[in-house]
UniProtKB/Swiss-Prot annotation:
Its EC number is 6.1.1.20. Its cofactor is Mg(2+). The lineage of its organism: Bacteria, Pseudomonadati, Pseudomonadota, Betaproteobacteria, Neisseriales. Residues 694-786 form the FDX-ACB domain. Pfam families: B3_4 (PF03483), B5 (PF03484), FDX-ACB (PF03147), tRNA_bind (PF01588), tRNA_synthFbeta (PF17759). This is Phenylalanine--tRNA ligase beta subunit. Residues 39-149 form the tRNA-binding domain. GO terms for cellular component: phenylalanine-tRNA ligase complex.
Amino acid sequence: MQFSYSWLKTQADTELSSDKLEHLLTMSGLEVEEAETAAPAFAGVVIAEVKSVEKHPDADRLNVTRVDAGTGGLVQIVCGAPNVKAGIKVPCSLPGAVLPGNFKIKPTKMRGEVSDGMLCSTDELGLPDDGVNGLHILPEDAPVGTNIREYLDLDDTLFTLKITPNRADCLSIKGIAREVSALTGCAFRQPEIHTAPITGSRKQPVQINAPADCGRFISRVIENVNARATTPDWMKQRLERSGIRSISALVDIGNYVMLEIGQPMHVFDADKLSGSLHIRRAREGETLECLNEKTVSLSENTLVVADEKGVLSLAGLMGGAASAVSDGTQNIVLEAAWFAPEIIAGKSRQYGFGSDSSFRFERGVDYRLQADAIERATELVLQICGGAAGEMVEAQGELPEAKQVGLRLDRLKTVLGVDIPAEQVETILQHLGLQPEKTAEGFRVTAPSFRFDIEIEADLIEEIGRVYGYENIPDDYTSGRLKMLELPETRRPRFAVYNEMAARGYREVVSYAFVDEQWEQDFAANADPIRLQNPLAAQYAVMRSTLIGGLVEILQNNLNRKQNRVCVFEIARVFSKGSDGQFVQNERIGGLWYGAVMPEQWGGKTRNADFYDIKADVENLLKNKAVEFVKTGHPALHPGRAANIVSDGKVIGFVGELHPKWLQKYDLPQAPLVFEIDMAAVLECGKTRYRVVSKFQPVRRDLAFVMPEAMSHDDLLLVLKGAANKLVQEISVFDVYRGTGLPEGMKSVAVKVILQDMENTLTDEAVEPLIGKLIGAATAAGARLRS
């Protein structure tokens, strides 16, 4: 939002310097991006009247002029401007003047003729282009000898504000003046709205066919206007200093009203309309040539203004060329409407262009402003272009309901940390136009029609805080005792998990929760993932249900950078659909190991990590829980090198080697090892129990069993452990043999059994019966003792 300080002062009676106003606005939340004067620095330029013009005797393109610059006599100046003529008033720089760029004016001779100064164009003064080839011609009543900076108010300050989306009420001079009044306590002078005399007979019927999209639409016909009328200099100046180029009087009036009070407007050529105006959704196949000469194909989610023949304009965005006013226009229709922000939002991006109107409508326009805007525009049209105004025609759809919000003074003090008197709070609310009503606890406020962001108590507290001034709230450092919170014995701290993974050689990574849909199909066999309505990009179209895809992508990035050993882990949320259709999110820890077990070094042989290496890492991570590894099939994993991690009969994760088919698809030289576990299961742990260390030596027995290949080592261990008693401290596999001496389809598995008593030294009489029992259990399960 760009505006001039001089225009602001017509509605806010403030005498603050521009620097102080800049600071005040920024501190209140209306960030000032830029503040600069209306013209660059120059001095010594006055208004002069050209009294005579004669051709230069020695130059075809030069003229010798005599001008009255208020010095008491005529000054001779040689001028080459094509539009110089007697009787005009122009800026004149006399000897001693300094123009932009530190260009100093001195008496000189041009082709033998004395020139005591220079007549100036807008370009030479650093002013906006007035579209004239030559001198900048001033109004006839411009006082001769007056400093041009004073006459044109060139020391005026131009502010550019960065208005946040929730403060659409500040996208006008009226809104900013209201804000300045609240911040400084100065008088707020609202623009005077005069009811136009009804002297015309024509009306423009209006029908709202989409009441949820258009809450109000007002039209007024003005007949017999002069479309060729010139926009007054004062209006041109205010528009230009607000960053809007003057086009024509009728268009300029619409833009002026929008900037002045905040209501976007549109002007139709009444003679180009057919029947009633309809505010409706676009229909399939409809197109529109817009004012920017761009023809667009309309979608059915677009609100349009149409007549009986077709679409006239994109509602709230841009008018159509077919119904636009021109120099030949005689009768016009003024339009002022309230469109729901939701129907306008996103249309600028959809059609590839925006406007000042759409910028305001998509943020929210005051829904009680339309009649005032029509009256103000009518007044200006009659004043500048003449004509006869007809009656207003209004159609109404669904308008927002004013919300009531309570403000508790105790809550205000708690949040802001300062006790603001109730009288001051009431004054601030009144200056903001919020019309407070006193209650037992504080105030009740009905959100005004121009404030869409006042919905809850916190919004009112924010308003009080920024107007009171956050810099005025004293620093008050609160003190409090730090209470040590005891962590339950059955839960390990989160940082311990991070430390454990780092100690095992893993590096933490963070990947996107938005992933490629193909990853979900490949690594989770998820044919129906949670899809995003507005994805950032095609490769971020769905929410992940597994961490494996992100870890594989990180591996690819590292391999592309010549890293041949990668150990990474991530703790993050995954997302899935519950049985009731609701979205479920769970936290998981995922890990990936690729390459050698240890970094390459001279003292030992290098080998690549295998399933048992990463299984050991998982066991270490879950060392405080009783877990089993059960062979499984998983879409991401090798069919023979994958296992589910089971605890208390519940699957809490999986571990294994990436499936061979994904190696080729994702261009991986060798298979990485991966795991993924529910984080809640990792953080849970059993109680640590004290166990006395036996002072008696253990006894070891080695048993070799011949068993079918189909029988797993784990099956054998489960049988042996089931037959063991309290003397058995450990049963584990230490060797596997296949080959000569064994029948086909059989293998030999060697198991060590460690026995130890806590009270006595074990004897053969105690050991041998137990070993026999273990052998018997194994034999019954299909494994015989190897002889």
